[in-house]
Curated annotation (Swiss-Prot):
Annotated gene: Igsf9
Ranges where the Fibronectin type-III domain occurs: 507-611, 623-718
Tissue and organ expression note: Expressed in hippocampal neurons (at protein level).
Stated name of the protein: Protein turtle homolog A
Annotated InterPro entries: FN3_dom, FN3_sf, Ig-like_dom, Ig-like_dom_sf, Ig-like_fold, Ig_I-set, Ig_sub, Ig_sub2
Lineage: Eukaryota, Metazoa, Chordata, Craniata, Vertebrata
Transmembrane segments: 735-755
A GO molecular-function annotation: cell-cell adhesion mediator activity
Signal peptide limits: 1-20
Glycosylation-annotated residues: N188, N513, N524
Intrachain disulfide bonds: C41-C108, C158-C206, C248-C301, C344-C395, C440-C486
Length: 1179
């Protein structure tokens, strides 16, 4: 700052001189502090009386002048200079009592009042610099006493002022610290200690010196911390029963010290045997009285003043005593048949010299017991435990100080040693990740303790032992591989057995015993392979030169593949007298194992023997030699090849050709455009986990060199594979097998898909075909013996149930063909063909009281047939309403004699021969099966066509009933009922009555059975009645013989009851099976018996029925409806139950029929069709 002011003043002065004015003079005045100095000023004229003027003294940095004198007036003085300044000899200023702060620039000015030119106001002035010299004085100092914690930093600062400026230095314990060193640094008068230690405590002196004098300041530094032991304890040796003292003294700040003593890390006051014999003195020493053998050991002194981490010092106390027995067991077990030891527990200091034994109170003579000897510690060793060892023993030990006495007596017992019950196998092979159980159990007396241990490096937390002492390795890991020992130990003996565990499916284990033999510019590396993990393993040798500089510790390793099966490798091309690191790596298909330990070796140099003189060559050397030193290196970027150029090059090297191969395959050219200037190349397109071999060939002009040395490299574990097309011909066999397998699988999958699609299409077509068949007209049964619809009715071929076959329905819909009196239609091959839409005949369908159907052949009259042909376009619902009923009932519901009207559409042949009355025909028996009780009343029924339709009588004409009845009249004498039953009429002679038809036979049974069954037991035969009808199954007539035989139950093998005899009523071409059931009962209790009662039951109920028969009253015709002329058969008595309900139903139907007939009578014949086909329910 001062020199800046000086430069400013000088610049002002120079600027004034540059204006052409008089150059002022600069005066320097030096004074000492406390003395006086005169600042000269000669601006006044030297002679004469000066004009009126004003004298001013200005100090640079002050706003106002420090001194102003005008004439004879009192001067104006600055307060800092009051009493210390005055004028002397003109305008000079005298300053008394100089101070350091008075130093600076002063200017003298004289203003003449008679001069009014403003340019000359400051012309009369001069500058004076006052320098005040003073001795050094401290402006800032550290405290006299400073406390600092140990390991903390501290700063001591000294600042001194003076003129000239003083120089500050520091001293510690009288030694100049200079600029400092280590933890102490001195800079610009400041002392800085980075880390205060115990030795940093002391006096630090700060000294400020200059030409005017020097000054000093001293600071005492106190370090707060744990104590420092200045007198540690020393090792000591005493005899037993003597006193001993161990010294310990420490220093610390603060000095509130507390001493503690420990024996073997236990406070001496916490040991019961020492509490009464130990003292700690004021100076920290330990006093121990009457020492004992147990007092020997390490004693530690620990002083403390409250700060953490107190110091400690230890010493060992040795106590000398005679040999003595510690604890002799009362019993000593020995193993039977094994080596045993009788121990004598002895302690002695000085050491033990010998031990004497007694057996059974007598001195033991070992020469009398072969195999007995003394152990190194005086124990008695018995080679074979037997009865000779039994007895009581005592021992007496001796050392240089003598003996403390004999031991108590111990009795020897013979015990069974541990013996293994379940021994592990010698070897175990198991896959990694699975569980392995190795049994091991032992017995003995006392029972032994079984334990497992792994030889070498053990497992932590992976091995478990179950309750049977078996070793469990769950899961099995790679670390479990090795040798395991099972040991059994008890008080008698200790036995072990071992086994080897081989863990399969892992990477190889580390190789062992790696050795390197140095060779000239090479090394021979050998090793012992580890376990291969269950797969074939291969090895590679890795080496690298040792880093010569620490800053380049990272370097690339070079690997060389080892031939398969070899356990050594010669590494060539090493630099002589250079230290190399070698390691061996094992690999298999699952990966790489750990590297072996690193071995260091220094290859040797070439021998210095003189070379043999070379003979003149007979052949010209090749003009181009091969590349040298080809090496493959694994780098983070991939596989990198290094090589040296050929030694012999003709003129210019054009390039290299890189060749490679896998294993023993042929050489392939990988790159033939490598530049001749290159000495390294990154090989692209390599495959993972493959062993490669590379070589180089150089070419120049027309010359091609021999191949270079082969460099081996494996890509196992390589993370980066340069992306390029795979090398030709180097596709691995596993990859090729996978590709071929994938293609084969794809082909098989496509073939199976095509076959499946074909099969699904065929199934779908079959389903559509079956669906069309279901949508086609329903199927009916037809006997096999009929060749066509025009077969003769008198065919001799029997029709059994096994000869029925399925045929297509000849009509589009059953409901359209169920018309009363519709003429027969020829069968049609297809429902949509015009030929298949013609009318078909439909016979009347009746239903008896038991709910079974009666079907009779009928043919519509000619005139009705013509009408039907004309009205064919009508809907089938109207034709369905045309129905016929052959039964009648009285209005009162009482059963009346049935009048059978001959409505058969088949006329009698012109020359029909009389024939016996046939038995029940096949259709009648078929309709009497329980199956037809399941048929839907309102279901569709197919038309039944006849071969030759004849002109039938009128549709509802009143025809006479057959003159001959099936049963004798009621008033006739009783005869053999079995002869008059329908089933027994086969043997009756020729009858002149009209031919027996199925309708007549069925009507007979409908009229006779209700009366008979009413008195029959409910449980007769096989009744399967239920609330809504019985569930029956279609089956042929029963072959079980009944009590007396009847037409209801034909004899076994009698198939004539189905279809036999020359004279039969026309057979039914079709029988429709109806699968849909519907409740047709009047109420919930409407039911039918599932079977007819037996013959004996019929005979029992037959006579009462005949006795109670009466004449059927004549029915009143209603609404012009024709009634039958005669009543036939017999009357039955009224029976409650189902018969009454049937009568009620019959009355309802008769009322409906009367209404229908009345309506039909009013209409023409061709228009008599029912408007409500749904009401045409067949009963």
């Amino acid at each position: 700052m001062i020199w800046c002011l000086r430069l400013t003043i000088l610049s002002l002065i120079l600027s004034q001189g540059a204006d052409g004015r008089r150059k002022p003079e600069v005066v320097s005045v030096v004074g000492r502090a406390g003395e006086s100095a005169v600042l000269g000023c000669d601006l006044l004229p030297p002679a004469g009386r000066p004009p009126l003027h004003v004298i001013e003294w200005l100090r640079f940095g002050f706003l106002l002048p420090i001194f102003i004198q005008f004439g004879l007036y009192s001067p104006r003085i600055d307060p800092d200079y009051v009493g210390r300044v005055r004028l002397q000899t003109g305008a000079s200023l005298q300053i008394e009592g100089l101070r350091v702060e008075d130093q600076g620039w002063y200017e003298c000015r004289v203003l003449f009042l008679d001069q009014h030119s403003p340019e000359q106001d400051f012309a009369n002035g001069s500058w004076v610099h006052l320098t005040v010299n003073s001795p050094p004085q401290f402006q800032e100092t550290p405290p006299l006493v400073l406390e600092v914690k140990e390991l903390e930093a501290v700063t001591l600062r000294c600042v001194a002022l003076g003129s000239p400026q003083p120089y500050v230095t520091w001293k510690f314990r009288g030694q100049d610290l200079g600029k400092g060193q280590g933890q102490v640094q001195v800079r610009n008068g400041t002392l800085w200690i980075r880390r205060v230690e115990r030795g940093s405590a002391g006096d630090y002196t700060c000294q400020a010196s200059s030409t005017e004098g020097s000054v000093t300041h001293t600071t005492q530094l106190l370090v707060l911390g744990p104590p420092v032991i200045v007198v540690p304890p020393n090792n000591n040796t005493v005899n037993a029963s003597q006193d001993v003292s161990l010294a310990c003294r420490a220093e610390a700040y603060p000095a509130n010290l507390t001493y503690s003593w420990f024996q073997d890390r236990i406070n001496v006051f916490h040991i019961s045997r020492l509490q009464s014999r130990v003292r700690i003195l004021v100076d920290g020493s330990l006093w121990l009285q009457a020492t004992q053998p147990d007092d020997a050991g390490h004693y530690t002194c620990v002083p403390s003043n409250g700060f953490p981490h107190p110091p400690s010092a230890s010493a060992y106390l040795t106590v000398l005593y005679p040999a003595q027995v510690t604890v002799m067991p009362p019993e000593t077990p020995l193993p039977i048949g094994m080596r045993g030891v009788i121990r004598c527990p002895v302690r002695a200091n000085p050491p033990l010299l010998f031990v004497t034994w007694t057996k059974d109170g007598q001195a033991l003579q070992l020469d009398k017991f072969p195999g007995w000897s003394l152990g190194p510690e005086g124990s008695l060793v018995i080679a074979l435990g037997n009865e000779d060892a039994l007895g009581e023993y005592s021992c007496t030990p001796y050392n240089s100080l003598g003996t403390a006495g004999s031991s108590p007596v111990t009795r020897v017992l013979l015990k069974a040693p541990p013996a293994f019950i379940d021994q592990p196998k010698e070897e175990y092979f198991q896959e990694v990740g699975r569980d392995l159980l190795i049994p091991c159990s032992a017995r003995g007396d006392p029972p032994p303790i079984v334990s497992w241990a792994k030889v070498g490096r053990g497992l932590q937390g992976q091995a478990q032992v179950d309750s049977n002492n078996s070793l469990i390795l769950r899961p099995l890991t790679k670390e479990a591989h090795g040798r395991w020992e099972c040991s059994a130990r008890n008080a008698v003996a200790h036995v072990t057995i071992s086994t080897n565990v081989y863990v399969l499916g892992t990477s190889p284990h580390v190789v062992t015993n790696v050795s390197v033999v140095p060779l000239p510019k090479g090394a021979n590396v050998s090793w012992e392979p580890g376990f291969d993990g269950g797969y074939l393993q291969r090895f590679s040798v890795w080496y690298t030169p040792l880093a010569k500089r620490p800053d380049r510790a990272h370097h690339d390793w070079v690997s060389l593949a080892v031939p398969m099966g070899a356990t050594h490798l010669l590494v060539p091309g090493l630099q002589a007298y250079t230290q190399y690191q070698f390691s061996v790596l094992a690999q298999n298909k699952l990966g790489s194992g750990p590297f072996s330990e690193i071995v260091l070796s220094i290859p040797e140099g070439l021998p210095t023997t003189p070379a043999v003189p070379r003979l003149p060559p007979t052949e010209m050397p090749p003009p181009l030699s091969p590349p040298r030193g080809l090496v493959a290196v694994r780098t983070p970027r991939g596989v990198l090849l290094h090589w040296d150029p050929p030694e012999l090059i003709p003129e210019r090297l054009d390039g290299y050709i890189l060749e490679g191969r896998q294993g023993s395959q042929g050489w392939e050219i990988l790159d033939q455009g490598v530049a001749g200037t290159e000495i390294q190349l990154l090989v692209p397109g390599l495959i993972k986990d493959v062993l490669y071999e590379f070589r180089l060939v150089a070419f120049a002009d027309s010359y091609v060199s021999d191949p270079s040395n082969i460099a081996n490299i494996s890509t196992s574990g390589l993370e980066v594979y340069p992306s390029r097309t795979q090398l030709p011909g180097l596709l691995p066999q596993p990859v090729l097998a996978g590709v071929v397998g994938g293609v084969c699988f794809l082909g098989v999958a496509v073939l199976v898909s095509i076959l499946a699609a074909c099969l699904m299409n065929r199934r779908r077509a079959a389903r559509r075909h079956r669906k069309r068949l279901r949508q086609d007209p329903p199927l009916i049964f037809s006997p096999r013996g009929r060749s066509g619809p025009h077969s003769a009715p008198g065919s001799d071929s029997p029709d059994s149930v096994t000869k029925f076959k399925l045929q297509g329905s000849p009509v589009p819909s059953l409901r359209q063909s169920l018309l009363w009196g519709e003429p027969a239609r020829p069968p049609s091959p297809h429902p949509d063909s015009p030929l298949g839409r013609g009318p078909l005949p439909l016979e009347p369908i009746c239903r008896g009281p038991d709910g079974r159907f009666v079907m009779g052949p009928t043919v519509a009259p000619p005139q009705e047939k013509l009408c039907l042909e004309r009205s064919e376009p009508r809907t089938s619902a109207k034709r369905l309403a045309q129905s016929l009923d052959c039964s009648s009932s009285s209005p009162s519901g009482v059963p009346q004699p049935l009048c059978i009207t001959d409505i058969s559409p088949v006329g009698q042949p012109p020359a029909a021969m009389p024939s016996p009355l046939p038995g029940p025909g096949p259709l009648l028996q078929y309709l009497s099966l329980p199956f037809f009780r399941e048929m839907n009343v309102d279901g569709d029924w197919p038309p039944l066509e006849e071969p030759t339709p004849a002109s039938p009588p009128d549709f509802m004409g009143s025809h006479p009933c057959p003159t001959s009845s099936f049963l004798p009249p009621p008033d006739s004498p009783p005869t053999n009922l079995r002869a008059v039953l329908p089933g027994t009429l086969m043997g009756v002679g020729v009858s002149s009555e009209p031919p027996y038809t199925a309708l007549a036979d069925w009507t007979l049974r409908e009229r006779v059975l209700p009366g008979l069954l009413s008195a029959a037991p409910r449980g007769s035969l096989t009744s399967q009645s239920s609330g809504r009808g019985s569930a029956s199954f279609l089956r042929p007539p029963s072959t079980a013989p009944s009590a007396g035989g009847s037409y209801l139950s034909p004899a076994p093998g009698d198939t004539s009851s189905w279809a036999s005899g020359p004279e039969r009523w026309p057979r039914r071409e079709h029988v429709v099976t109806v699968s849909k059931r519907r409740n047709t009962s009047v109420d919930e209790n409407y039911e039918w018996d599932s079977e007819f009662p037996g013959d004996m039951e019929l005979l029992e109920t037959w006579h009462p029925g005949l006795a109670s028969s009466r004449a059927h009253p004549e029915l009143e015709p209603e609404l012009g409806v024709k009634t039958p002329e005669k009543s036939c058969l017999l009357n039955t008595t009224h029976a409650p139950g189902p018969e009454a309900r049937c009568a009620a139903l019959r009355e309802e139907f008769l009322a409906f029929r009367r209404r229908r007939d009345a309506t039909r009578a009013r209409l023409p014949v061709c228009q008599q069709s029912i408007s409500y086909p749904e009401q045409a329910t067949l009963l």
